[in-house]
Amino acid sequence: MVSADFKNWSALEIVFEADAADLAMPVPLAVDSSTPNIDFYTRCAMKYPWAEDVYLMMPSAYYHWGADEYPATMDVQLLTSRDGICWRRAGERAPFLRQGSDGSSTSGMY
């Protein structure tokens, strides 16, 4: 959304969401395959101040495993954009920040 006066706004536009590659990720057999297995949280974007026309986003990718034997996990991905509208994922969707091993002090969601 864009506004010059903070009173009149442009129409809403989705600029980032789970896509076909996210939804095609393999999940354990115990999961209900009729629902998406990923959600994105903390999708705040920022303009990188030391380069012209560079925006960064670090959304948390929350993976739903659905059954107790498969813990829900969350990784942070890195996205870049030149205009704040069209986003590219860095590292072929590999986590930019990954959770620690099970049982470690960094294994929790937050």
PLM segments and residue spans:
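Carbohydrate-active catalytic/glycan-binding domains of CAZyme proteins
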Residues: 1-110
